[in-house]
Amino acid sequence: MVLSVIGNLGSDAELVNIKGKKYMHMNVACNEQRKKDNGDQAEVTYWCSVYFKESSKMLEYLKKGKRIYASGTCRINTTVKEGKCYLDISLFAQCFQLL
């Protein structure tokens, strides 16, 4: 599945090693406006882990609060904690841009 996200970094980007390959990792908050049953607007935040092939030169610019765009292959896993179901959204980006 291909997914595109626009959102703000929840923390500074970091380099991580996954199965011997280096990636830049970012936690991205994506906000959505929804109407409640009573008609009021509510903002819902989704968190997405974005991985991009190592680009250590960009790390100095990718600080908490910066806005980014990323598009790529999406993996979604579910976990159950204390009876609640949580989604873990991971995006392995082929396209990435600092906004």
Language-model-detected regions and their locations in the chain:
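Single-stranded nucleic acid-binding surfaces, predominantly the OB-fold ssDNA-binding core
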Residues: 1-99
